[in-house]
Design a protein with these regions (language model features):
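Internal helical hairpin/lid segments
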Residues: 167-223
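ATP/nucleoside-binding phosphotransfer catalytic cores, i.e., glycine-rich phosphate-binding loops
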Residues: 208-278
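Short, acidic/small-residue loops that bind anionic groups at enzyme active sites
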Residues: 65-89, 97-103, 234-237
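Conserved anion/nucleotide-ligand pocket segment
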Residues: 95-161
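Buried hydrophobic positions in well-ordered alpha/beta secondary-structure cores of metabolic enzymes
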Residues: 49, 82, 156, 204, ...
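ATP/NTP phosphate-donor binding region
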Residues: 1-45
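N-terminal glycine-rich "phosphate-gripper" loop used for MgATP/nucleotide binding
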Residues: 51-59
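Short internal beta-strands
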Residues: 14-17, 79, 201-208, 239
Length: 278
């Protein structure tokens, strides 16, 4: 469905060799998947790499990839969830932007014309993002501008101490996750805090934490309360329940690009800025 929709939208689609394959939990062996990604990164005719889905597996192959040619001729890497590994690696090591956005699987629900997939289409056409979201009782009001960084909370926590570790100073950080126990969200947020990832932010965007789980003995807080309390000592604006998630409500966000964030109790406004000159 994604290939059909993209073709109808004027894009030419080139399926990867491992698309639709299966090797245990993965779409191929590590060497096959790495070779497939490498080929797409190096192909000068490919202008964007659209990941089919997330799940797990990028961390197994990231160190096998040679980015030498890609760094000279970068292209959009589109995806989220497990793709956070690749996107964070590209920004932290090479200052290359990427698109945190719906993946191919999102086209299969019969809603390929929804505003979130349209936001991806707009990004690919070079249109600047300008999003307004509903307010939230937990919002901490304020304004900020800075480079956008972030992705899936689990992956961001797991990348700490690796070559792909996220750099957050003066950035607007966004986080989201799915199917996590509340105590684990607490643990991962403290991992970010203790490693210095939360103290020097320009702002924080808390996306959706889809299908949260609680333990038999209740944790005593929901995920929003956990995050609110962990960052309460800092002064930057924080918004909650922003439409970035594992659900269909998932706006395209350009990691590595500058945005302006305005947060109030009644709404959140996120606007992409013109590129800064180096």
């Amino acid at each position: 469905m994604a290939i059909e929709t993209l073709t109808e939208g004027g894009f030419n689609a080139l399926p990867g060799k491992t698309l639709g394959n299966q090797f245990n939990y993965f779409s191929g062996t590590d060497s096959d998947r790495a070779a497939d990604l490498q080929k797409m990164l190096d192909n000068g005719n490919v202008k964007a790499i659209f990941c089919a889905r997330g799940g797990y597996g990028m961390g197994r192959i990231i160190d096998q990839i040679n980015f030498k040619r890609f760094r000279k001729h970068p292209k959009w890497i589109i995806g989220f969830s497990d793709i956070t590994v690749l996107q964070t690696h590209l920004l932290s090591r090479y200052k290359i932007a990427s698109l945190h956005a719906p993946m191919a699987a999102a086209f299969n629900d019969g809603e390929s014309g929804n505003e979130y997939i349209c936001s991806l289409h707009n990004a690919l056409l070079g249109r600047k993002a300008n999003y307004t979201a509903a307010g939230d009782d937990y919002n901490r009001s304020g304004k900020a501008s800075g480079m956008l960084a972030g992705g899936n909370l689990s992956l961001l926590a797991h990348l700490i101490g690796t070559k792909s570790d996220i750099k957050t100073k003066d950035k607007i950080l966004f986080i989201e996750d799915v199917g996590e126990y509340i105590y684990n969200v607490d643990r991962m947020m403290y991992q970010l805090k203790r490693s210095g990832k939360l103290k020097d932010l320009a702002g924080l965007i808390v996306g959706r934490f889809t299908e949260p789980k609680d333990t038999v003995i209740p944790f005593g807080q929901d995920t929003e309360e956990v995050i609110r309390d962990i960052v309460k000592e800092y002064n930057y604006p924080v918004c909650f329940n922003f439409p970035v998630s594992h659900d269909k409500e998932n706006y395209a966000l350009k990691i590595g690009v500058h945005y302006k964030l305005a947060v109030s109790e009644t709404m959140t406004h996120l606007k992409e800025l013109s590129e800064k000159k180096s």
